Amino acid sequence: MIFLMQNNTRLQRLILVFCLLSVLGCSGNGDKETPQLSDPTAPVGEERLTVPGSVKPILDVWMRDTYVTYHAADGFYYLTGTTASPDREFVGQTHCWDYNDGLYLWRSKDMKNWEEMGRIWSFDEDAAPWQKKGSPIKPGATSLNGDPLDSIYRAVWAPELHYIESKDKWLMVACLNGGNGSFVLESISGKPEGPYRNIQGNAEQAIFENIDLSLFEDDDGSVYLVGHNHFIAKMNEQLDGLAEPFRRIEETPYASEPYIEGVWIEKHDGQYHLLQTVWSVPQDDGSYSYIRDDKKDSVLHSYDVIVASADAVYGPYGPRYPAIIEGGHNNIFQDEHGDWWSTLFFNPRGVMGTRFDITCRPAVLPVKWEQGKLMPDAEAATAFYQDIHF
């Protein structure tokens, strides 16, 4: 009897320990939840999210990575982007994959009639030695599009022009090809057309080691650099360097992260919105996904804008959602009426790119926010483009 009682007591203790371990394992720090992931489904064919057919070039200049901003003080829209050297004779199609000569700027009162302001920064006259140097190209090399390349990588890509309201100052951010990093320029005249010089933080080397640098000014005047394509750093008060090292943005990723580019941060309705660009690819079941094998470029379909939102600029950003099909590497801005617009450039790559009559030209797309999400405004696009004949 004593033996049975002792065994029963021991069994009760074992059951109690097991129950305690079970409770601890299902609560508090012991709870290992499955990480949240973004849905990689690409809604190819969804008309309301696709760049409308009414959209056409607003300027007959070869350009990629179109950027537009509106400056209320003078009532002008300013346009820039990745351009090709205007006096260069190409073997085959116009491109910027090896070299170009600098940064160009246009302005307009209505986004339909553009005034050329010329080259506002050049390698030969304005660049620092590290920017002029470039990188050699192997003989016989071609671009991703099959364009024959010259002997040097020395092109400036993806420029952005920003008026920093809290400092009454114009800055430009841009990057170099050939793995030579990104930089920030400041206008020494206080005007958007410059002339421009390097800030101290990139006088001798790149301020960010990769491409596609962007800039964001918050409501409190804090200015951040946002880099390819998951990094952010606050600038110092003088805007001549960084106040902190670049850190990784907290995101909700896909199960397998693809190549992502064209970063942009915008604040709307108290939230921060992280815009990025990613390619869709077809799946065996007929659907499309943003998860792909980066080596299979031949199956690229559409060049899409995805968006994620957060309550803080560093994140965490929630699940990504598709916003603009075939409108990638964009920025968004508000016009003089407070209406929203996005930029695009008719990327020739991918299946959808082959459908364009003309590619690599700047365009703008009216967009809207519906239930906190960004999307094209097809009705406004039709109205804007009805008297533009290209």
Predicted segments, located by residue:
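Bacterial N-terminal signal peptides that target proteins for export
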Residues: 4-15
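C-terminal motif of bacterial Sec signal peptides marking the signal peptidase cleavage site
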Residues: 23-25
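Carbohydrate-active catalytic/glycan-binding domains of CAZyme proteins
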Residues: 27-390
